[in-house]
Regions:
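GST-like fold's C-terminal all-alpha helical module
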Residues: 79-173
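Acidic/histidine-enriched, glycine/proline-rich intrinsically disordered or flexible terminal extensions
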Residues: 177-182
Length: 182
């Protein structure tokens, strides 16, 4: 979102195992990402994204109409619950040596089942870049590192990734650690 809105920002990579005490005081859940903007500290990725959309309204990443905005928020919620939560399980169990094959298969299957939706428009269910794309693209970027392999039937998703991973704003949004993921 910050790159899409061309906002200058200082990004600090934080190891969750070494969560800074100063951040822990402001974020009782010790989750990432955290946004610090002057005296304001926000956590929870959805809240951070919506704050950035309101703080930096141009270019808009949410539609102008309340019904369309609500539908987009619902999509973001589903992406979080259906896909991002699975990715979190995979990451945490990979570190702990747990078996994540079933979660990987479920995530791949769920993504593949909606692959046709990626073929209809340039962006995900939209003609323009939106917060939904900002929510979804980082997850798709991380799939190889999560050990999630999509089948050929997911071609519309591969095409979507090919279109957006090369965008200047997407590339600008990647940290050095993220660049090494692919």
């Amino acid at each position: 979102v910050l790159a899409e809105k061309q906002v200058d920002v200082e990004v600090k990579d934080i190891d969750p195992a070494k969560y800074p005490a100063a951040l822990a005081d402001a974020n009782p859940y010790r989750t990432l990402p955290v946004l610090q903007d002057r005296d304001l500290v926000l956590y929870d990725s959805t809240i951070v994204l919506e704050y950035l959309e309101e703080r930096y309204p141009h270019p808009p990443l949410l539609p102008a109409y309340p019904v369309a905005r609500a539908q987009m928020r619902l999509l973001m919620h589903r992406i979080q619950k259906d896909w991002c939560d699975s990715a979190d399980v995979i990451m945490s169990q990979q570190k702990g040596g747990g078996d994540v094959q079933q979660v990987r298969r479920q995530l791949a299957s769920s993504l593949t089942s909606v692959a046709p939706l990626f073929a209809d428009k340039k962006f995900f269910l939209n003609e323009e870049m939106s917060l939904v794309d900002c929510y979804l693209l980082p997850l798709l970027w991380r799939l190889p590192g999560l050990g999630v392999e999509l089948p050929r039937q997911a071609k519309p998703i591969f095409d979507y990734m090919d279109r957006h991973f090369v965008r200047d704003t997407f590339q600008a949004s990647l940290s050095p650690v993220e660049r090494e993921m692919r």
